């Protein structure tokens, strides 16, 4: 096997003559500058390839749940689209930037455009995931729905405009590699024009600025909404805590990267390599992790009855029919004068704000169709028609108490309706007291 580190081209570079020290130094600097210029692209490729491999176990669990339900939910659709568009984008990007596979200008142009378009489509899909989560958190708010719709259309327009404007390796060089056509076919005067680029002329700057402002606004609004509507006695409820932490992690990762790149573009627009791919790669990685974390929280065994409510299938939300159909944690106790109902959940106080109870378990009445029940802080003791307690309830038998799985959600109903009189003639009235 031959060693391919570039040394085989050195004799051709210097015409077979022993190189001077200045020539060797210049060649080494050129090699280093080329590596540095392509570093953002290589970082993005490494991040995305590692993320694709890392998510396969979670994807297998997701496909197993999909096989059981026979139909996907919106989170699974978003995950599959983002992941496999990313795979194709990375493959074409590596072919263009790291190999000699291209043979014609058409190869470079088609692969470069496909890769770039898929990258920006993944960015828009991650933006759709954020908007979809926000729509569920804000429930039926028309203002939120219109704002998210307008923002999504704006993001898609800015993404496609940036995709059209950014440089792509769409021309074949004499060496057999792909490079931007402006470098391959343009003269020196056209090349120098790119060195006078200002930040407001950069489409990447406006793409990053739009994403940073709108995503940060949505995520901060979601955090405030969760704090207001999903706090119980011990803080945020279980699923609300997952949503809140994912929002914070997304802002800490993606928006911080965007702000750093925006500052760099403000000062050194003409001196920077393409940085939008690195930002999109971080956005994809955090977005996939956000989808995986929330799906695992919903469908994990410890959260089978403590997750999202029966979110309507026409809205494409989270739904867990298997858990709702197999719930066996309900108990009923009857005695003659009143009815008592309560829900017990480990790790909570007197509320079921974080319980996504299905209708079969009796807790669906507290949820709202099309929303997460984990976001509705309705105490268990709130009833539409409260009954005044007149007789204290009887304790259940020992056998019934042992059959209740206290480790999971338990709904107990004590029916104490009046006992009907026994059949037969009514008993004779008691004699009047002796006077």
From Swiss-Prot:
The lineage's top-level taxon is Eukaryota
Record membrane topology: Multi-pass membrane protein
Q: Name one GO cellular component term.
A: plasma membrane
User: Biased composition, Polar residues: where in the chain?
Assistant: 392-404
Please list the residues annotated as glycosylated: 330
Main location group: membrane
**What post-translational modification information does the record give?**
O-mannosylated by PMT4. Is also N-glycosylated.
* Compositional bias per record (Pro residues), positions renumbered to this chain: 418-435
| Subcellular localization | Cell membrane
Q: What induces it?
A: Expression is highly up-regulated during all stages of pathogenic development. Expression is positively regulated by the unfolded protein response (UPR) signaling via the binding of CIB1 to the UPRE motif localized at the PIT1/PIT2 promoter.
- Transmembrane annotation, as ranges: 33-53, 77-97, 111-131, 143-163, 204-224
Q: Where is this region: Disordered?
A: 392-435
Q: Which controlled-vocabulary keywords does the entry list?
A: Cell membrane, Glycoprotein, Membrane, Transmembrane, Transmembrane helix
Entry function: Plasma membrane virulence factor required for spreading and inducing tumors in infected leaves.
Q: What is this protein called?
A: Virulence factor PIT1
């Amino acid at each position: 096997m031959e060693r391919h580190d570039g040394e085989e081209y050195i004799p051709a570079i210097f015409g077979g003559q022993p190189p001077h020290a200045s020539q060797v130094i210049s060649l080494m600097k050129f090699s280093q500058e080329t590596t540095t210029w392509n570093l953002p692209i290589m970082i993005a490729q490494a991040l995305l390839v590692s993320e694709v491999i890392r998510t396969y176990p979670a994807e297998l669990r997701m496909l197993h749940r999909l096989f059981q339900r026979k139909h996907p939910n919106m989170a699974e659709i978003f995950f599959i689209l983002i992941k496999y568009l990313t795979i194709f984008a990375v493959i074409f990007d590596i072919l263009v930037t790291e190999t000699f596979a291209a043979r014609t200008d058409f190869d470079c142009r088609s692969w470069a455009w496909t890769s770039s378009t898929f990258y920006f489509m993944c960015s828009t899909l991650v933006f759709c995931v954020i908007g979809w989560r926000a729509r569920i958190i804000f429930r039926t708010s028309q203002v939120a729905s219109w704002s998210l719709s307008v923002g999504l259309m704006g993001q898609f327009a800015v993404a496609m405009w940036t995709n059209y404007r950014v440089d792509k390796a769409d021309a074949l060089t004499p060496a057999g590699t792909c490079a931007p056509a402006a470098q391959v076919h343009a003269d020196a005067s056209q090349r120098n024009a790119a060195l006078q680029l200002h930040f407001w002329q950069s489409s990447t700057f406006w793409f990053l600025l739009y994403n940073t402002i709108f995503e940060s606004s949505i995520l901060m609004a979601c955090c405030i909404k969760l704090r207001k509507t999903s706090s119980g006695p011990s803080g945020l409820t279980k699923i609300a805590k997952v949503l809140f932490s994912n929002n914070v992690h997304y802002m800490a990762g993606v928006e911080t990267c965007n702000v750093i790149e925006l500052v760099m573009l403000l000062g050194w627009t003409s001196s920077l390599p393409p940085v939008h791919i690195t930002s999109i790669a971080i956005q994809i990685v955090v977005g996939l992790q956000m989808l995986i974390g929330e799906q695992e929280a919903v469908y994990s065994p410890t959260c089978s009855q403590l997750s999202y409510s029966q979110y309507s299938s026409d809205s494409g939300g989270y739904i867990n029919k298997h858990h709702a159909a197999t719930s066996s944690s309900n108990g009923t106790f009857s005695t003659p004068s009143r009815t008592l109902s309560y829900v017990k959940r480990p790790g909570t106080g007197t509320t079921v704000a974080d319980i996504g109870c299905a209708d079969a378990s009796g807790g669906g009445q507290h949820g709202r169709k099309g929303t997460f029940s984990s976001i509705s802080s309705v105490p268990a003791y709130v009833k539409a028609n409260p009954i005044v307690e007149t007789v204290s309830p009887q304790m259940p038998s020992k056998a019934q108490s042992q059959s209740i799985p206290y480790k999971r959600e338990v709904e107990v109903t004590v029916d104490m309706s009046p006992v009907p009189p026994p059949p037969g003639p009514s008993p004779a009235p008691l004699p009047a007291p002796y006077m």
